[in-house]
A protein has these predicted regions:
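Domain-level signal for Mg2+-assisted phosphodiester chemistry and nucleotide/NA-binding surfaces
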Residues: 1-132
Length: 132
């Protein structure tokens, strides 16, 4: 009797690690990843973890991610307006979610970001002192 295997993927963590890995491999030739290609790579990477020799069978891949923010914000230093719904990150993530939905045995589970408490975080203390 075969063992059914479910795979859980932390979407944002996977994407960051994957892009970091690609940047190290390609160096200066790195280009932003096509969302369709990224969806394909996520699916195939998960399938590589199914061990057919141990009689494992894929039940489902659960891809957990958040919807990107559509909020309008201001840069902390210049107070210049920024519409997050028009950013390239927003478009890439929405497109990725659309491609992931079409993959067999893959379930997209969307959380949400609290738009009311979303704010800029400047981790570099030197830049923080310069800004404020």
């Amino acid at each position: 009797m075969s063992k059914k295997v479910a795979i859980l993927v932390d979407g944002d963590f996977f994407i960051r690690c994957y892009k970091s890995h690609l940047k190290k491999q390609s160096g200066d030739k790195y280009e932003n990843l096509n969302p369709k290609k990224l969806a394909y790579n996520i699916h195939t990477h998960c399938l590589k973890h199914i061990n057919k020799k141990n009689d494992e069978e894929l039940y489902r891949i659960f891809f957990y991610d958040c919807k990107p923010l559509e909020k309008k914000v201001h840069y902390p230093h210049t107070q210049q307006a920024l519409d997050l719904s028009k950013s390239s990150t927003y478009r890439e993530r929405k497109e990725l979610h659309e491609h992931l939905i079409s993959k067999p045995c893959l379930a997209l589970r969307l959380g949400y970001l609290d738009a009311n408490n979303a704010r800029w975080v400047i981790r570099d203390q030197k830049k923080r002192k310069e800004t404020f």
